[in-house]
A protein has these predicted regions:
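Cleavable N-terminal export/targeting peptides
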Residues: 1-26
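Transmembrane beta-barrel domains of Gram-negative outer membranes and organellar outer membranes
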Residues: 19-246
Length: 246
């Protein structure tokens, strides 16, 4: 086991809405010590009963240890003509097992999001990350628990909600790989039947690639076109991610 159990417990204690945001991406469990990363994400889609939602973010991440990667983001959200909302996000990823030591690699993600330009609740997320391989196929599946916390002193209580991510990737060559991605939310984590109105799922084809540019530097990309179902999920979502690693 790569990460001491103490860190696993602390991470779970620090962090505890089921809708998959238009710029969400599939988390990977692996961590590379010393790696620095500038990360840009973008997503856009229109839910059945709402206006177009556009989300973009810019972040900087660092592989602080062999098992811990930390990243800070600034995120901008726009919905129709209602103006922009700016959020700050702190993401921490922990690699729990040595890569390839067991048939399934495992990690843990924790994330805290706070409003910057407007009042609103904080959000926290935590969940296990899984990855396995069959020949040139790479499979990922993540289970996430999310909760909002009131920041205005109103004492508003929010439920803990469950969401998921999955990805299938065929590693054709380093510069171009293809597959599919899926995101979804089930509503309250312990009351899926009563949360049917909040349930939403999206799935679609995806492409991936990595271009080495020398001296441990690389540019990575992935993008997907997702088809959604549910009252809160856009019928079609375009999402993309561009990373510069150095």
């Amino acid at each position: 086991m790569k990460i001491p159990v103490t860190y696993f417990v602390l991470a779970a204690l620090v962090t505890s809405s089921a809708f998959a945001g238009t710029a969400d991406y599939v988390y990977m469990p692996a961590v590379e010590h010393g790696e620095r990363e500038i990360d840009f994400k973008y997503g856009s889609g229109t839910p059945p009963a709402g206006e177009r939602q556009t989300v973009s973010s810019l972040g900087f991440g660092y592989g602080a240890t062999e098992y811990w990667f930390t990243e800070l983001y600034l995120k901008r959200e726009t919905e129709g003509n209602s103006g922009d909302v700016t959020l700050a996000e702190w993401e921490n990823k922990f690699q729990l097992l040595e890569t390839g030591e067991y048939p399934i690699d495992m990690g843990l993600i924790t994330e805290i999001e706070a409003p910057v330009s407007a009042s609103g609740p904080w959000e926290a997320k935590v969940g296990p990350l899984f990855q396995t391989e069959f020949g040139k196929l790479q499979l990922n599946a993540n289970a996430l628990f999310e909760r909002k916390y009131s920041s205005d002193g109103s004492g508003t209580q929010y439920p803990t909600e469950f969401s998921y991510q999955w990805q299938i990737k065929y590693r054709l060559q380093t510069e171009f790989e293809f597959g599919a991605q899926g995101f979804g939310g089930m509503g309250e984590w312990d009351n899926w039947v009563g949360s049917k109105a909040e349930e939403g799922h999206s799935v679609g084809p995806a492409i991936f690639g990595k271009f080495p540019v020398g001296n441990r530097q690389a540019v990575k990309y992935n993008a997907a076109w997702l088809v959604g179902t549910g009252a809160t999920t856009p019928g079609h979502t375009l999402r993309m991610q561009l990373e510069y690693e150095f």
